Every structure is written in structure tokens, then in C-alpha cells.
Design a protein with these regions (language model features):
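Short, basic and Ser/Thr-rich N-terminal targeting/leader segments
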Residues: 8, 15-17, 98, 167-168, ...
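Anion-binding (especially nucleotide phosphate/pyrophosphate-binding) glycine-rich loop
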Residues: 1-80, 84
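Phosphate/pyrophosphate- and phosphate-bearing ligand-binding catalytic cores of soluble enzymes
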Residues: 21, 105-249
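Structural signature of FAD isoalloxazine-binding scaffolds in flavoprotein oxidoreductases
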Residues: 22-39, 85-115, 129-136
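Residues embedded in well-ordered beta-strands within globular domains across many folds
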Residues: 41, 71, 103, 243-244
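A generic local secondary-structure boundary/capping motif
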Residues: 20-21, 59-62, 70-74, 87-94, ...
Length: 249
């Protein structure tokens, strides 16, 4: 399907779990969902995952073999493909820290890319910049006692649940600005509870916009734009969205 659309020069979008993705209510045309492309193989201290595997499933496979590295990332609700695209991270760790090789589809050709030809930065990657379709990735981990691995993952989950809203959301709305959380600026402007239609700034964590009921993609877009404008006016900085917008909103 990707090869066909590429040959026809038609635009298409790749989705995993749709984490951190705002999709137009009017539709977006050609979408390919890869969340069912699954498979995990452990080879010594390396774990090979296909793009549709969730970070939770990869963590569990690693834990089963006493491999450490994915504890901090285990609560990220996205797939491996999506995590690699945006270099997902949490608690000081990023998926790019562990990648040794990825297999991608690009220009209708399947190719393996070694670590020396990869780069990852804060919520960005060569995958995103070049439009690679990730098929699988190899992650190098380290051996550790299983009880210590599980304890760290549990601690991260406890912190996450205490800090983040339970209501439906797209995850963190904005990236950090010069290492300062966007939530700091939003909270400083007393914008918790600020809303547009069914979209509302979480009262639990200012970095999240939640769906309080019936929110549309337009509600979300208008609210996030308003937040950006207010922060720009007050602090003179431009907040960059962490979420990806697909379609016309």
C-alpha cells in the first residue's frame, strides 16, 4: 500500500496507537494503521520489536529476561514505531538511548539503518525528518535483577498516576522550552481549567489538554493556539507543540 501511494505521489499518514496525534474530524484521506504489526524476539542483551508493539509489551518481554532500560518508558501508551519517530521519553530516559538498528520502508525499499547513521534529539529523530516508515527496531539493554527492574517501573507508574490526569487526552501538549516544562508557564498564568468547547486544560497537570466531554479537533486546536498566544504575550517565548496534527483543522 505504501509503495502504491508513493508511486502515485499521494499523501498518506502512518499511525500506531494515535498517541500524541490530533486528527481532523473532517477526515484525513489515506491512513495506514500499523498497531497490529507485532512480534518480539530477545537475543542475548538485545530485544527486537516490530513497529506495532507497545512500550508496555516490550518492557514486559525485557523484564522476563532480566533486561533493564525500558522501565521508565513502560508507561508510554504508544507503539515502538511512534516512540522512535518522536524519540519518546520519560523520567530522564529516551527510546533513542537504546537503539542499535532500525528496519524501515523508504521510497518503496526496505532497508536497515545502523546506529552510526541514526540520530535522535528531544522529541525528534531522523525517522521523523526523513519520513521513514519504521518496521522494526533493535534495542540494546543491560542485565539487572528482575525485582529491581519491576520496582523501578512501579515507581515510575506511581509518579505518573499521581501527576497526570485520568481523563482522555493526547498526552503532553507542548514540548519543553529550554529545558523548562511548558506546564510551568501555563500554570504561572493560572490557565488550569481554561477551556474551549469540550477541550480543557487539566486542573491536575497544566501540560495536558483533556476531553471533558464532546471535544472536537477544532476545540483542541483553538485552545492550544490560545495557550501559545498567552504564553508568548506574557513570557516572550514560543511553545512548540509536542502533538502531531493530521489533516486540516
Amino acid at each position: 500500500a505504501v509503495e502504491y501511494l508513493t508511486e502515485k505521489n499521494e499523501k498518506f499518514f502512518i499511525l500506531g496507537n494515535g498517541t500524541n496525534t490530533l486528527i481532523s474530524d473532517d477526515g484525513v484521506g489515506n491512513v495506514m494503521c500499523l498497531k497490529r504489526v507485532k512480534g518480539i524476539e530477545v537475543r542475548g542483551e538485545e530485544i527486537v520489536g516490530r513497529c506495532g508493539e507497545t512500550m508496555k509489551s516490550l518492557y514486559r518481554a525485557a523484564l522476563d529476561k532480566g533486561l533493564s532500560g525500558l522501565e521508565e518508558l513502560s508507561g508510554i501508551p504508544g507503539t515502538l514505531g511512534g516512540a522512535l519517530t518522536m524519540n519518546a521519553g520519560a523520567f530522564g530516559a529516551e527510546i533513542g538511548d537504546y537503539v542499535t538498528e532500525i528496519t524501515v520502508l523508504h521510497g518503496g525499499i526496505v532497508q536497515k539503518i545502523q546506529k552510526s547513521d541514526l540520530w535522535f534529539s528531544y522529541r525528534d529523530s531522523v525517522v521523523k525528518k526523513k519520513g521513514y516508515v519504521v518496521l522494526s527496531a533493535t534495542l540494546r539493554l543491560k542485565r539487572k535483577e528482575k525485582n529491581l527492574i519491576a520496582a523501578r517501573a512501579k515507581d515510575c507508574e506511581t509518579i505518573r498516576r499521581a501527576a497526570q490526569p485520568d481523563s482522555p487526552s493526547l498526552g503532553s501538549t507542548f514540548k519543553k522550552h529550554d529545558l523548562v516544562s511548558a506546564a510551568y508557564y501555563i500554570d504561572a498564568l493560572n490557565l488550569k481549567g481554561f477551556s474551549e468547547g469540550g477541550a480543557k486544560v487539566s486542573e491536575k497537570h497544566a501540560g495536558f489538554i483533556i476531553n471533558s466531554g464532546g471535544a472536537t479537533s477544532r476545540d483542541y486546536k483553538i485552545l492550544s493556539d490560545a495557550i501559545s498566544d498567552k504564553v508568548k504575550c506574557a513570557f516572550g517565548i514560543n511553545l512548540e507543540r509536542e502533538i502531531e496534527i493530521i489533516g486540516n483543522i
